[in-house]
Amino acid sequence: MKLLSLVAVVGCLLVPPAEANKSSEDIRCKCICPPYRNISGHIYNQNVSQKDCNCLHVVEPMPVPGHDVEAYCLLCECRYEERSTTTIKVIIVIYLSVVGALLLYMAFLMLVDPLIRKPDAYTEQLHNEEENEDARSMAAAAASLGGPRANTVLERVEGAQQRWKLQVQEQRKTVFDRHKMLS
């Protein structure tokens, strides 16, 4: 894709900017003449040089008789227009090349995405162990609340943590399920 756009840019630079090679759409004099007396308005296009871009050289055939030509030409607005179709073509080729490259990149990512996001068996096992551990600790906390008093400092801290976790869980249920404020 980069090679194609590079070739297009080099081709554009190597094309000689000669006015003789340009088509009538590239260089033109456009005269817009409004309605005049019983003559309807009209748009005239002519391939003439910039110095000849006026009503007398562009408007052919002249729709008014000889003595009204000057008054008619004063109403007409003539503009010289020049564009480079080669540059337009090069820009379109570059644009299409970029869009094509992005589409290819998107297709590549769609093909590679399942390989990248493949679930890792080890992380799934760790996640399942954490869930099981949480469930066991909740059950142990519920049992320890009603059971005999803990003897060691470590067991007391664990018991306090379990009570705190149960309290937080209860508050979550109250707030999210029952939509009540914290007490």
Swiss-Prot record:
Signal sequence, start to end: 1-20
Glycosylation sites: 21, 38, 47
GO CC terms: intercellular bridge; intracellular membrane-bounded organelle; late endosome; lysosomal membrane; lysosome; microtubule cytoskeleton; mitotic spindle; multivesicular body membrane
Tissue expression: Highly expressed in adrenal gland, thyroid gland, testis, ovary and prostate. Moderate expression in trachea, spinal cord, stomach, colon, small intestine and spleen. Low expression in bone marrow, lymph node, thymus and peripheral blood lymphocytes. Expression is detected in hematopoietic cell lines including those of myeloid, erythroid, B- and T-cell origin.
Cross-referenced Pfam families: Tmemb_9
Residue intervals annotated with topology Extracellular: 21-89
Keyword Acetylation: no
Topological domain ranges for the Cytoplasmic compartment: 111-183
PTM: N-glycosylated.
Subcellular location: Lysosome membrane; Late endosome membrane; Endosome, Multivesicular body membrane
Main location: membrane
Modified residues (Phosphoserine): 137, 144
Gene Ontology terms describing biological process: endosomal lumen acidification; lysosomal lumen acidification; positive regulation of canonical Wnt signaling pathway; protein transport; proton-transporting V-type ATPase complex assembly; regulation of protein catabolic process
Keywords for this protein: Endosome, Glycoprotein, Lysosome, Membrane, Phosphoprotein, Protein transport, Signal, Transmembrane, Transmembrane helix, Transport
The protein's role, per its UniProt record: Transmembrane protein that binds to and facilitates the assembly of lysosomal proton-transporting V-type ATPase (v-ATPase), resulting in enhanced lysosomal acidification and trafficking. By bringing the v-ATPase accessory protein ATP6AP2 and the v-ATPase subunit ATP6V0D1 together, allows v-ATPase complex formation and activation. TMEM9-controlled vesicular acidification induces hyperactivation of Wnt/beta-catenin signaling, involved in development, tissue homeostasis and tissue regeneration, through lysosomal degradation of adenomatous polyposis coli/APC.
Record's subunit section: Interacts with the v-ATPase accessory protein ATP6AP2 and with the v-ATPase complex subunit ATP6V0D1; these interactions lead to the assembly of the v-ATPase complex.
Family named by the database record: Belongs to the TMEM9 family.
Protein name per the record: Proton-transporting V-type ATPase complex assembly regulator TMEM9
Biological source species: Homo sapiens (Human)
